[in-house]
């Protein structure tokens, strides 16, 4: 089934963030860059939201702390240390796939900072549980936002339905006036325009 104008593609996932971004922070990504070829994508953010906005860079492999820091120093925002920079592995690819079906304002990329670049050491026994706790805490805030979006979309759908019903009535009335006055198509269009506006 093709998505409707009220449907959304939401990518909710984990990412690494610059050290100035606390673990557990939820960010809405306003710029996605695919590091392999440098292509950049801009999801339209047309909705009020409680999140920080950030740039996200998608790498083809996991970034350890050293390579992540080199990337930050060399490429991403080296001049502005306060800039919110995130890295993941999938957002740019999801945007490109979603772009076939969704408009830029229908795609949201919500990322939770779970680390500041991985370490080379093997993961500790509790690290999976710690990751789940971070994502679960962030999910509450994200779900609240998604519920607000859905409420807004339902309201917009009802308004669109009412407008469509009104337009249909106006069209019928314009046709009746055209027939009664033996008017042309141009006259019918003028009657329709005067009724609508």
What do the PLM-derived regions correspond to, one by one?
Residues 1-197:
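Glycine-rich phosphate- or other oxyanion-binding loops that anchor nucleotides, phosphorylated ligands
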